[in-house]
A protein has these predicted regions:
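Sec-exported extracytoplasmic/periplasmic mature domains
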Residues: 107-111, 162, 175-179, 384, ...
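Conserved beta-strand positions that form and line the central face of beta-propeller blades
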Residues: 134, 287, 324, 394, ...
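Sequence/structural segment immediately N-terminal to covalent heme-attachment motifs in c-type
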Residues: 372-398, 407, 411-424
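Flexible coil segments in periplasmic/lumen-exposed cytochrome c-class electron-transfer proteins
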Residues: 359-374, 380, 432-490
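Copper-binding active sites and cupredoxin-like electron-transfer domains
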Residues: 6-381, 399
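Detector for the c-type heme attachment site
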Residues: 158-161, 196, 390-398, 423, ...
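Hydrophobic, well-ordered secondary-structure elements that form the walls
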Residues: 291, 310, 405, 422, ...
Length: 490
């Protein structure tokens, strides 16, 4: 709902009445001295949000924030050293009232290797607090500020090199509620985008250090919601029920990229762009700048899984910027009739909840213990997310368009050729099981050697095919010996 003192037109009324000329704004803040006893701020980790401010006076609010440098999973089987506010990425969500006086305690854990500080965009003062909060490992800095402006604000570390601190996850959101508070909604969630720059490729297993050159070139390895691939999918998806009004507090830590924030299958009834106090109505996609925010509100009218993406779409399906809103309740066939989104649409390779199957095989292969059955299981997961749109889940393809893999004489005749096709694509006429095909398969060289090996092991041993395993070493050898078409990924 709106950051407003007046009552806006109800969401989705469709009444045809003229819109109010003023779509937002609020009563002036109460900037008098704090009243009552000091209040300890409630801090939450994404996607949770602290409860609304339930008072009608300015208070002294004490915020205790600890910086931790932690090795955490950025994707299944991939670890990264995150620098965090509050132990997670994004940092803890803070919720205060316009006119509050905030006493901010920034503590840098003794195990940290770096000094840190904090720049809160909600602060009026030099550096947004950064000049007063420089904190060495094992130390604590304290400063105070008055929340003069309402809105949804980013905070981040501003210690040199600033870009590196932000790229390692040092950002979060602080909400300054208007004096009258926010109108009630049914569900509120905290979603923050950021990109990460690793030495290894996307989903390359093991520990991955920060890559400064990639960051300078703005060539992100990962673009993620809430700090890790899969943070908002499967059992971790945010949840609502039909009829709920959902409010998303959306931030973008950057450090470089602007987010094209979109929920597939929903239209935002209201968007408070850049975290301000005026709203736009009936918005499909909203831009959230690096170091900026937006507050979106919408009513969910039908059940299903609604996919949250950065609509700069390769980031969603090839770099991880994908989440889920799962809505339960009764169908409303007058609004929407049809099947729920097919899983193969949800990711270029595989949904994050299935990554553990793939990761386990990768680990087993590195120790020489991977079995053929494990490779087939991992290959099935990867095939369903990558190949089944064209070749179909049953491997039968589409007659006259996409050749079959099931009982395929062409596939089974030459496993090395199959590797070359997976890496480099195929164009031109071929004959499969006696039928001609003349379509185009794009190179899939963005997949790593393990993934291609497991997909081929699955296809060579499914749907009546009886073949051998393909190893990642075989794929690596073909990758090294052949040249990719222009424009193919490496």
């Amino acid at each position: 709902m709106a950051l407003v003192a007046c009552q806006p037109q109800p969401v989705g009324t469709g009444s045809g009445k003229a819109h109010q000329a003023d779509t937002g704004g609020s009563a002036a803040g109460d900037f008098g001295p704090p009243q009552g006893d000091p209040i300890q701020a409630v801090l939450t980790s994404a996607p949770d949000v602290p409860p609304p401010v339930d008072r009608d006076y300015p208070a002294k609010v004490i915020v205790d924030m600890e910086v931790r440098e932690l090795d955490l999973e950025i994707s299944e089987g991939v670890t990264y050293t995150f620098w965090t506010f509050g132990g997670g990425v994004p940092g803890s969500f803070m919720r205060i009232r316009q006119g509050d006086t905030v006493e901010f305690h920034l503590k840098n854990h003794p195990d940290s290797k770096m000094p840190h500080n904090i720049d809160l965009h909600a602060v009026t003062g030099p550096g947004g607090g950064a000049t007063s909060s420089f904190t060495a490992p094992g130390h604590e800095a304290v400063f105070s500020f008055k929340a003069l402006n309402q809105g949804l604000y980013v905070y981040h570390c501003a210690t040199a090199p600033v870009g590196m601190h932000v790229a390692n996850g040092m950002y979060g959101l602080i909400l300054v509620e208007p004096p009258e508070g926010l109108p009630p909604v049914d569900k509120e969630f905290y979603v923050m985008q950021g990109e990460f720059y690793t030495v290894g490729k996307y989903r390359e297993k093991g520990y991955q250090p920060f890559d400064m050159q990639k960051a300078i070139e703005e060539n992100a390895t990962y673009v993620l919601f809430n700090g890790s691939e899969g943070a908002l999918v499967g059992e971790k998806a945010i949840k609502a029920s039909v009829g709920d009004t959902v409010r998303l507090f959306v931030g973008n830590g950057g450090p470089n990229l602007v987010s094209s924030f979109h929920v597939i299958g929903e239209i935002f009834d209201k968007v408070f762009q850049e975290g301000g106090t005026r709203y736009q109505e009936n918005v499909q996609t909203t831009l959230v700048p690096a170091g900026g925010s937006a507050m979106t509100e919408f009513r969910v009218d039908v059940p299903g899984t609604f996919i949250i993406v950065d609509h700069s779409i390769f980031r969603a399906f090839n770099k991880g910027a994908l989440g889920m809103l799962k809505v339960d309740g009764d169908d409303n066939l007058s609004v929407y009739s049809g099947k729920e989104v097919d899983n193969v649409y949800l990711g270029d390779k595989v949904m994050a909840e299935d990554l553990s199957i793939v990761s386990a095989v990768t680990l087993a292969e590195s120790t020489g213990t991977a079995t053929k059955e494990q490779r087939i299981d991992a290959g099935r997961v990867l095939y369903n997310g990558t190949c089944s749109v064209c070749h179909q889940q049953n491997g039968e393809g589409l007659e006259g368009v996409f050749p079959p893999l099931a009982n395929s004489d062409y596939l089974m005749a030459d496993s090395r050729r199959a590797i070359e096709i997976a890496l480099n694509g195929l164009a031109g006429p071929v004959t499969v099981n006696g039928s001609p095909f003349n379509s185009v398969m794009p190179p899939m060289s963005q997949l790593n050697d393990d993934e291609i090996a497991n997909i081929l092991t699955f296809t060579l041993n499914s749907w009546g095919n009886e073949g051998d395993t393909v190893s990642s070493a075989e794929v690596a050898a073909v990758r090294a010996a052949t040249e990719r078409p222009k424009g193919a990924a490496e």
